[in-house]
Each structure stands twice: as structure tokens, then as C-alpha cells.
Amino acid sequence: GAYLRNDNYQNVIEEIYELFPILRKKKYQLVGELSGGQRQQVALGRALMIKPSVLMLDEPTAGVSPIVMDELFDHIIKVKRTNVAILMVEQNAKQALSISDRGYVLVTGENRYSGTGKELLNDSRVRSSFLGG
């Protein structure tokens, strides 16, 4: 990895298992045998192992079913509660804004709208153009 740990990482692993309990049950299973949502949890857990202050997520729900998407957003909320700042790019704007402290809507690569997640969800221009009404 990019950063090698010299401390006892067992405590960090325990924190990851508390965030993602299914991973404890699947710890002896190969990652390739896990579901898409479980693999995303492994990816989040790996990123959290270095105790980052900022976590960057690029389309974390891409290619997963709606049920798994809801589960992943629940996990992102759990990570947010650990005081890790999250910078996320996400096509599912409505759900992403619903959990965001701050949001930016880009149009052809330029920032068109910004505000709190709640402000953007309530902005009629954002709703009609990007959130389906």
C-alpha cells in the first residue's frame, strides 16, 4: 500500500468490521466471490484502514442494483459519522444530495449550482433539470 502501518492494526480492523458487519462474516471468502455491494464495502474498508481525513469516492454506486445502492449510501452515512470528510462524484444526484452537507452541480464541466444538499434539492431549477422534476 501507499502507507505502511507500524501500529497494531487490529483495532482499525475491528472499527471496519463495526462499520461493515457483513465483512466479518465473509473475512475468509475471496473478494471475487463477494457480491458487488460487498466488494464496495471492502473497497471502503481498505481506504479507511489508513485513517484518512478525506475520503474520495468516484461513482461508488455505479453498476449496482437499487437495493445495493441504498445499502451503500447507508454505509457512506456511517463513514460520514466517523468525522471523515467525503468528496463524492455521483450520478444519483438526488440520493447524493440528500446526504450531503454541501453539493455542486456541474454542467459541461463547470459549476452551475452550489449550496447545501437540502438547498439544491429544493432549488426548482436543479429539480427540473437534474432530478426529474
Which role does the model predict for each range below?
Residues 47-48:
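ABC ATPase C-loop
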Residues 70-82:
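Helical segment within the ABC ATPase nucleotide-binding domain
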Residues 55-59:
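Catalytic Walker B motif of ABC-type/P-loop ATPase nucleotide-binding domains
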